[in-house]
C-alpha cells in the first residue's frame, strides 16, 4: 500500500508479505494505518516520509531484512523508517527480527513513539541526527528486548532511561565486525558507567520510561 499526496485515508486489516516494502505514507496528512501485518519485506515495514498528523498503531512488522543492505549507505531493512518532517504518532506496534527496528533521519524527530515493542532487532534504532529526542509519552515508553536496566519498585517501568542509539551503538554501527561484543560484561559495564555519568545526555533518542 502506497499513499502519496493524500489526506484523511485509512488502511487496516491488510497483510504484506515477501515484497520490497510494506506500507508507505509519503507527502500525506491525517492517515490512519492500524491493525496491519507486514513480514519478510526487504526495505521497510512502514515508511513515513514527509507525512504529518498521521497515526500508525497496532501494526505487527517482522523480519524486514535486506540481504544487500550496507550500514555505510543506510540501506538495511527497517521495521519503520521515519524520514523528513512531520508530527505523527506511532503507538502499540511491534517491530521484530528486523535489520533495524526503527530508522530516523532528516527531520523525523517530530514523530513520537510510545508503547511499541522492539524485539530481537539486530540494531534497535538508527538515528541520523544530533537532536535530543524523547520516545515516551505521559510516563509510558516502549518495550526493548535489549534493555539492560532494572525495575526495583516493580511498577512496570524501567528505573533508568534507555538510549537505543548511544555512543556504543554508534561505534558498533561504524565497526560492525565488533558486534559480537554487544552483550559482553564489559559493554554492559560501559553502558552502566555512561548512564551514571550521563555521558550521552542530550544526544540522540532516549526512552525515559522503558516498559
Question: Which residues does each PLM region occupy?
Answer:
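Parallel beta-helix/beta-solenoid
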Residues: 1, 5-6, 11, 28, ...
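Short glycine/acidic-rich loop motifs that flank beta-strands on beta-rich extracellular proteins
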Residues: 1-4, 20-27, 42-50, 65-72, ...
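Residue-level signal for pocket-adjacent positions within structured domains
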Residues: 18, 75, 157
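Short coil-to-beta transitions that initiate beta-strands within beta-rich domains
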Residues: 28, 40, 73-78, 82-85
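Membrane-proximal low-complexity regions enriched in glycine and acidic/polar residues
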Residues: 83-92, 96-112, 119-120, 125-126
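Acidic, glycine- and Ser/Thr-rich low-complexity intrinsically disordered tracts
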Residues: 107-211
